[in-house]
Amino acid sequence: MEKIEGDFSKFWRFDVLPPINRLSWWWWWVLVLVPDPIHPERSRQLMVLWSSKETPAIRVSGHWWIPKARMYVDEEGGSVMSGMVCAWWYDGNKMFEPLLMKECRMASVDDKHPLWPVEAKETGMGAGAVVPLTSEDLSFGLRPGRRSFWLNLTSDQEKVMEGSPKDFSVEMTPWWERPSTAKYKNNVFGLNMGYDIQRVHGMKAKLNIDGEEVEGSAYIQKVGVQAPSLPWFWGMLHFDDGSYLDWFMPHVSPSFTMKDDTPWSMRDFFRTPNAGSGIFHDANRNRTENFKRCTVELERQEGENALRDEQGNLLPRFKIKVWNGRTQVSIHVRATSRARWVFDQPTRAGFVSHLTYNEYPLEIEKIAILDEQGLRSIDDYEWIRGNAEHAWGILN
């Protein structure tokens, strides 16, 4: 596969829907997963986010962000927006979070914009970039001809002093057709509320960490959301043969009333699923399974081998099941660390809405894939790497 397939005509634009005060939220999100030589059952992971929001003010993990201007879109479709570049790095043992949390102005252009380099050629194919206007190179982009994505990042100096790497650069190339073809979803509920999502489920990745190059995989998404955020579970797995699996279970729960980032609240004791789903790009069968049924169970790790986050909280274990009429997948995974983003947004009449968004690097304990051709287990794969999300609260 020589290039990344799919329609990238809107990948570098966020003006698909008219903005809604306090509800519109836009971001590009990249997750890179590479081997951990010390703990081979785990993975080292880098997450980078370029984000903006239509809001008078919002507190992000203790930092008040007050946008200085609204998003500006020129006649050629280029955008300039106030926002933040945020990142975390998990080295297999320690979570550096935030690795970076930097306010900046960002410009995004595609390969049809006059500012796109003339020498790039092959215009109109969806290449483009988001370039934070900072002294460091914090850019993310798709090269001409859609041959590869790139990402550059420089860590916060304080985190470098704590032991994190300073410089990261990533080159992401196609893996195979199904996971490396961009998937697009757009849904408008009414009153301009809805979502606009584009994802590339699986890419090969070469990650350079302070001069050390290591190979792994990457997941990329571009999201625009215009609706209150409710609690959810989400997660994904990359397999050594190029297979990709994910699950998504938004749910109704008393956890939407939670106002801090402390896990294991009594308010999170039951959850009513709301339209769970999943997808499995199965390289072994050369097919894609779409799932409309999904369950996620959450429990604390227990015993002498139980792991804790950087704040001393016991980490979770997830039990996931997705299935359709032909294939059923059951997964047992445990979190090996936790990165959390805590959002507090003033609303009406002095009230403040809250969202805690947790990201968990995973260790895969068991997996069972049952279809008409038989049963597969963790022993059928050289490695499986993944990440899971759990969010509570409601941001509006």
Annotated model-derived regions:
Residues 1-396:
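Structured soluble/peripheral alpha/beta segments that form catalytic or ligand/cofactor-binding pockets
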